Amino acid sequence: ADRIFVMGHVNEDYDAIGATIGMAKLGLSLGKETYIVSSEHNAYYKRITEVLDNENIILSANETKYIDIMRSGADALPLVTNKSLLIIVDHHREVLSASKAVLQAAKNRIIIDHHRRAEDIIGDTTLLYLEPSSSSTSELVTELIGYFDDRLDITPAEATALYAGIVLDTKNFNVQTGERTFEAAALLRRCGANPNLIRQLFKDDLSFVQQKAKLIAGAKMPIPGLSIAIMRNADNDTMSSVLAAQTADTLITIESVAVGMAIVEYKDG
């Protein structure tokens, strides 16, 4: 490949970010021109760089800062050639891709994901690595890093980003965990992943907490065991998907609630 592009899903979360950083690390270590294709609204990446910057930790691979190799879909598209490789992480459906244009332009594609296979899976892939039993895509990428090269040095910042992805999707190691999850976490801890920084990453501001409390307070139980919260007019809220996910997680911690749902309403449907 002349260039490597790594792309997560739209509105990337910590798992998508950790996985893109991990795969970009592998590309850079091979001496390849490597780019991360990101969506327009990337609040999680901004958050992780802010937390690391506050500790004077630079998220980089050797002399390359990851923020410097990030490209929007529009900026990345002219760089894609017939020899380029696109690594798709943490999703496998075109509708979820950070850039559909880059996806369609890339002739050589690899998918690495932990979600169950959907009917509308992206086709024409060189390699398809779907592992639904894995806790997260960050776990899968950490395993690949472990197998890749003994000389590959993972920095504490890179390890922290991958660790954050595992923590997010396992809800702090409470769900969807197995032996491989803890082995990956142990590898990242040996590389310097910082749990204290992880806790800072998952802190929410007061406005976010108030929004979540409002949604929970307005939740209804149409039938026993099912609780539904509805978030309306969310078109301009870049954190709406995160808010919905956290609201649903909170609903199922309520006694007598077996299923928690948070529905986000957009004007375009």
Summary of predicted features, one role per range:
Residues 1-12, 16-56, 60-61, 66-69, ...:
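Hydrophobic helix-and-loop "lid/oligomerization" segment in the mid-to-C-terminal part
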Residues 8-10, 39-40, 62, 89-92, ...:
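Fold-independent oxyanion-binding glycine-rich loops
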Residues 23, 103-106, 127-128, 184:
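Glycine-rich, phosphate-binding/catalytic loops in enzymes
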Residues 35, 85-87, 108-112, 127-130, ...:
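Hydrophobic/aromatic beta-strand patches that form the interior of the parallel beta-sheet core
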Residues 51-56, 105, 128-130:
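Short, hinge-like loop/turn segments at secondary-structure boundaries
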Residues 62-124:
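Active-site cofactor/cluster-binding pocket
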Residues 74-77, 98-101, 128-131, 151-152, ...:
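A generic local secondary-structure boundary/capping motif
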Residues 114-185:
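Short alpha-helices
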